[in-house]
Amino acid sequence: MERNDAERKIEKLRNQLEEYGYHYYVLDKPLVSDAEYDGLMNELIELEEAFPELKSDTSPSVRVGGPPLPHFEKVEHRTPMLSLGNAFSDQDLRDFDRRVRQVVGDEVTYSCELKIDGLAISLIYESGRFVRGATRGDGTTGEDITQNLRTIPSIPLRLKEAVSLEVRGEAFMPKRSFEALNEAKEAAGEERFANPRNAAAGSLRQLDPKLAAKRHLDAFIYAIGSVEGKELHSHHEGLNYLKTIGFKINPESAYCESIDEVIDYVNSWLERRADLPYEIDGIVIKVDNVNFQEQLGYTAKSPRWAIAYKFPAEEVITTLLDITLNVGRTGVVTPTAELKPVTVAGTTVKRASLHNEDLIREKDIRLGDSVVVKKAGDIIPEVVNVLTELRTGEERPFSMPTHCPECGSELVRLEGEVALRCINPQCPAQIREGLIHFVSRQAMNIDGLGEKVITQLFEHGLIHNVADLYKLNKDELLQLERMGEKSVNNLLASIETSKKSSLERLLFGLGIRFVGSKAAKTLAMHFPTMTELRRASYDELIAVNEIGEKMAASIVSYFEKPEVNELIDELASLGVNMTYNGPKPIGEEEIADSPFAGKTVVLTGKLQALTRGEAKEKIEALGGKVTGSVSKNTDLLVAGEDAGSKLTKAKELNIEIWDEEALVKAISH
């Protein structure tokens, strides 16, 4: 076949397969048999192999998966992928409605959607072509899993409109696919997946896209993150638009004109959810009007215009076999119930937290008891109560120890606390847990250093404190179980990258008592070098908004310890950054004088000097509000390179337009 003939045939096959795939996977209305579809796909693959220069990353043939990837790259989300606040009762929903109406008035309506139990994803399209897909990650930074997402048939590779946009959705594994996968794993002598959510997440984190393609995943799209050249006034209007350009939208979504209708919708799914072909763990309720959403805004963690109703936790009965003790990084000794394995909310549960000695005494929990277990919020296993009527007389009371189970030091109960605590700073359990915390995502974010690797390193005597992580070498790491050369090289690169982390990550990672990630950011903004923070007095600390007396006293006490100062000096000598890299705190007077104060700003095009996330953070610190689309309410558009339809629309609406140079100048003053 001549090249020109092949090109025409390939394009025809692609169009046919796209149309058949859309009807089968999105509309659930197949036009041809599976055998006919497979025959056309094989014909396309053969032609693309014969003419490799005609291959395309939007061809339906990529659904079968490409070559294995060396690792997943990290990518920054254009706008953060926030979590949602939770509701557990009708009253919680009414309270949410009351808070909304206090801000926007009584003319509020809602969009309701099933909360799919899967993996949150972000998809980016440029001129209608799928160019990047990522996991949620920590909400700001995720992993690029584009190649694996291309294998999901319901995710369009080309849209029906040449639009540039970002959408949010949920990738999931249908129940039928999950059952088939577990049957295959069992037949192969492998461990079964606990639930479809874990199976979906594991499938999308396969480095070999061909394996992901065999897992038969699906995806629903539920929101637009940003879109160029399209003004949408409501959430349900946005969903309808997404459907028309080729996305799979959950047909069970509903528009509700009052909170009573929302509650009826929620309650209707309490029984019906078991009949769905996929798992759901609740209902998402969103204020429908986009302008109302903007008025309500966001907290640090979630939008104020949306909430997730979580279904009541499933409760089951099992036997409490034993109570074991765990020592955390702060020395708190937590009793854990060891249970006869039981399935709760689709997950095999073997352990549940008992929190502290007072709870054990209060519930009269004994070894051998029959207990009721549930998963609070369908996440954390919890012992609800004891079925004392089932006791046989062989059950044994449990007493908390007087000494640490890890190091033997005497346990203490600090004033005002119910927990028993080991106060030995050399306790191996505390050191190990502290190391795990230091490398975690919100702290130094060292990929490849999970709990198992840290435990191995610690038990082999290769690390004793966090500074030792930066002294690890290739030969030492190759001695560990399941660590090949590629894994070791990636890990060493990740350790090296973490040295550049901003000061707030290091502060959070050090595990100073009472200092969470938000407080660490506040401290770093006000004391932008480790030297300044180490010298800060108690009075200087409590003068900072959000730093209370207890936290200030803890920080002063922490930096008074010689071993702490030795550790920090050692980290600095190993090249770990000791300065704050983010925007400086802005005073009220400076905000009032800012060119962004009270203005709605839109960013478009590629920025060179800083990322969109950095620009957004700095504009908002100076009193501005950054949104994703241009409208009559937009005050200012910042246009980077290759600015598209947003720039055109801004000109039509006579909106003020800046280039990147003007932006950098404004945020630098």
Swiss-Prot record:
Q: Can you tell me which residues bind Zn(2+)?
A: C404, C407, C422, C427
- Name the EC number(s): 6.5.1.2
Q: Note whether DNA damage occurs among the keywords.
A: yes
Which residues are recorded as binding NAD(+)?
A: D34, A35, E36, Y37, D38, S83, L84, E113, R136, E170, K286, K310
Q: One biological process GO term for this chain?
A: DNA repair
Q: Which cysteines are joined by disulfide bonds?
A: none
The terms describing its cellular component in GO are: cytosol
Keywords from UniProt, A to Z, are: DNA damage, DNA repair, DNA replication, Ligase, Magnesium, Manganese, Metal-binding, NAD, Zinc
Q: What's the cofactor?
A: Mg(2+); Mn(2+)
Keyword tRNA-binding set for record: no
Q: Which parts of the sequence belong to the BRCT domain? A: 591-669
> Which family is this protein grouped under?
Belongs to the NAD-dependent DNA ligase family. LigA subfamily.
NCBIfam families found in the cross-reference section: dnlj (TIGR00575), PRK07956.1 (NF005932)
The record's function comment reads: DNA ligase that catalyzes the formation of phosphodiester linkages between 5'-phosphoryl and 3'-hydroxyl groups in double-stranded DNA using NAD as a coenzyme and as the energy source for the reaction. It is essential for DNA replication and repair of damaged DNA.
Protein name as catalogued: DNA ligase
